Amino acid sequence: MSSYEIPAVTVKPGSTVIAVRRSLSTRWISLLTLVALVVIWWAVTATAMIEPLFLPPPSAVLQKGWLLVTTGYMDSTLWQHLGASLSRIGLGLGFAVLTAVPVGIAIGDNRIARGILDPLIEFYRPIPPLAYLPLIVIWCGIGELSKVLLIYLAIFAPIAIATATGVRTVDPAKLRAAQSLGATKAQLIRHVILPSALPDILTGVRIGLGVGWSTLVAAELIAATSGLGFMVQSAAQFLVTDVVVLGILVIALIAFAMEMGLRALQRKLVPWHGQAH
């Protein structure tokens, strides 16, 4: 069997125009919401309704941000803190995708693999990362391995479960058609199962990435000397609220940018997903 291709999806011009208009409308609503939140933040701090110790004004956060970029905080600049966190998130996400997708395919496609692996994933998935953080430190020490491993475990479960769900929902007619043409098991996985499960896999990656960012602060509690989570925790101990707010905003912006990138990738790779037929 040489190749299997997914049929092209025909999109009507009228529906494309409507989709673009709806997208622009949604973006304007999102932008106005963001502007409104910043205005409320500024108004609350300008009228001294909340003391700067608890909520610094936007101008103070921006000034502190420039100071962190130029001189740094806790012996590292903002870029160094950001680079350390991104490397940990990137390694955790990369290893999770490389291992969770094959595991999810095995769970969704093989009864024995499902019986062995599914209970293990469901057993540890609800446990908060902070609960098994001490055990990881005992096993792996306080180096980078323990930080990346904690993030990896947090991201692994959502991707594996989403992949298994996508595999189980593959149209049996597609599998039978490919088998009738002489497809091997490897060809079925590559040309039928993976393309059909791709929307669920990408959704799992998006969910896992969000969980990974929320685990980052816990991971950087392990004897870290740099990283956004470390920066926020250190600033909180000394009540440096503007650094805390800045760190939270940077994490939110980076996570949001990654989420938008994954959404764009999902629209590019699986344009038919979510369309009304």
Where are these regions (language model features)?
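C-terminal transmembrane helix and the adjacent membrane-cytosol boundary/short C-terminal tail
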Residues: R111, R168, T203, L246-H277
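Transmembrane alpha-helices
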Residues: L149, L153, K185-A219, D242, ...
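Alpha-helical membrane-protein architecture signal
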Residues: L62, D75, W79, G83, ...
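Transmembrane-helix boundary motif in ABC transporter permease subunits
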Residues: L91-I121
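Periplasmic/extracellular loop-to-transmembrane helix junction in inner-membrane transport proteins
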Residues: V17-A19, T47-G94
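Generic hydrophobic transmembrane alpha-helix motif, especially the helices
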Residues: E122-P158, T165-G166
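Short cytoplasmic-facing helical segments at TM-TM junctions of multi-pass membrane proteins
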Residues: A162-I207, L228
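Transmembrane alpha-helical segments of polytopic membrane transport and secretion proteins
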Residues: M1-V35, M260-H277
